[in-house]
Amino acid sequence: MLRDEDRIFTNIYGLKDKSLRGAMARGHWDGTKQFLEKGRDWIINEVKASGLRGRGGAGFPTGLKWSFMPKESDGRPHYLVVNADESEPGTCKDRDIMRHDPHTLIEGCVIASFAMGAHAAYIYVRGEFIREREALQAAIDECYEYGLLGKNNKLGYDIDIYVHHGAGAYICGEETALLESLEGKKGQPRLKPPFPANMGLYGCPTTVNNVESIAVTPTILRRGAGWYTSFGRPNNHGTKLYSVSGHVNRPCTVEDAMSIPFHELIEKHCGGIRGGWDNLLAVIPGGSSVPCVPGAQMKDAIMDYDGLRELGSGLGTAAVIVMDKSTDIIKAIWRLSAFYKHESCGQCTPCREGTGWMMRVMERMVQGRAQKREIDMLFDVTKQVEGHTICALGDAAAWPIQGLIKHFRPEMEKRIDEYTRNATSHGAVLEAAE
């Protein structure tokens, strides 16, 4: 379990002073100018050495991503864009950073912008986050007044930070759709290549990072890459914010070390499973877009990228959704299908048509008003959507259903049998989805 002195986010619950003075008293903005004086290469190499992987879901090495930016300017400005469009069902970590600990993010923006030669950073905040945006803007205004941001500031590097409010579309959490939205266009993902590091915002070199990825970098530089790599297993280093919701006794967002066993995370921070461990049905370990894992497999699972991949799932945003045996698992996954159908931007045919198909067949599965062969047909549809779209929304819509079929097929067949038995006893004629 992580000790309090090792926590990066010291005010994640908003119990302390979140102003600039309070943040400085807790050690933020300490030595920032010295980091900038050490140069861009030192910062990028230190972040690489720390093994920090993107905290937005994909887990791409952050230092490597920063190094893709052109070293020399070709006349075009460089931009840093922070993805604060936190819309993944179950995820609520970034909003706590912006609402209660915004100076970790602002200091991170300054350091990351300097490392990539950017003089402007844009923070794209989810449309529904009203209070979070107000808190973040107030913190930015404080930094301007104190002389930490703007032209000729105390840090010796000109940097402006702008907050942009989204309009409520989940698809704008995809980095290229976010850039389109930021430019004032319809939020639809772009084809890659060209990648944002080459042609991003307004056609200029851009790096898009998650809020948590940016917010942890100042502490990594202050305490050293060696300190950060002391947490977690190889290739899964550092600390992580876990958002635990669902059927636990105390749902919470908590910072702990990577590679913590699932049962330890739940027992130490959440007061255990509602009704005890025998009552655990399934867990979605990384936000709604990763497959669910049965409770029996999940108890001893290691909460990191590799540990959950071995179970056929993923860490994603570390939004842990716990379901006990009172849950209708088929209906829960249908609800996710309905979400993805609603949020598909409609640009790619497999996703536009496939999400609707998956939702409608899942609706039949919830009622049991289906044939057993439709389970295989549903799986085939998910395979035709997965990997055939510009962005990962198609995969995100397909994976929860694949996880359901893989682990809970007997439950689906049982429901079909029950419905068929009741229907045929009343002389009804069953139809297949085809």
UniProtKB/Swiss-Prot annotation:
[4Fe-4S] cluster binds at residues 345, 348, 351, 391. It comes from the Bacteria. The keyword Membrane does not apply. InterPro entries: ComplexI_51kDa_subunit (IPR050837), NADH-UbQ_OxRdtase_51kDa_CS (IPR001949), NADH-UbQ_OxRdtase_suF (IPR011537), Nuo51_FMN-bd (IPR011538), Nuo51_FMN-bd_sf (IPR037225), Nuop51_4Fe4S-bd (IPR019575), Nuop51_4Fe4S-bd_sf (IPR037207), SLBB_dom (IPR054765). It catalyses: a quinone + NADH + 5 H(+)(in) = a quinol + NAD(+) + 4 H(+)(out). Its cofactor is FMN; [4Fe-4S] cluster. Its EC number is 7.1.1.-. Binds 1 FMN. NAD(+) binds at residues 54-63. FMN binds at residues 166-213. GO terms for molecular function: 4 iron, 4 sulfur cluster binding; FMN binding; metal ion binding; NAD binding; NADH dehydrogenase (ubiquinone) activity; quinone binding. Pfam families: Complex1_51K (PF01512), NADH_4Fe-4S (PF10589), SLBB_2 (PF22461). Keywords: 4Fe-4S, Flavoprotein, FMN, Iron, Iron-sulfur, Metal-binding, NAD, Quinone, Translocase, Ubiquinone. It is an enzyme of class 7 (translocase). Belongs to the complex I 51 kDa subunit family. NDH-1 shuttles electrons from NADH, via FMN and iron-sulfur (Fe-S) centers, to quinones in the respiratory chain. The immediate electron acceptor for the enzyme in this species is believed to be ubiquinone. Couples the redox reaction to proton translocation (for every two electrons transferred, four hydrogen ions are translocated across the cytoplasmic membrane), and thus conserves the redox energy in a proton gradient. This is NADH-quinone oxidoreductase subunit F 1. It comes from Rhizobium meliloti (strain 1021) (Ensifer meliloti).
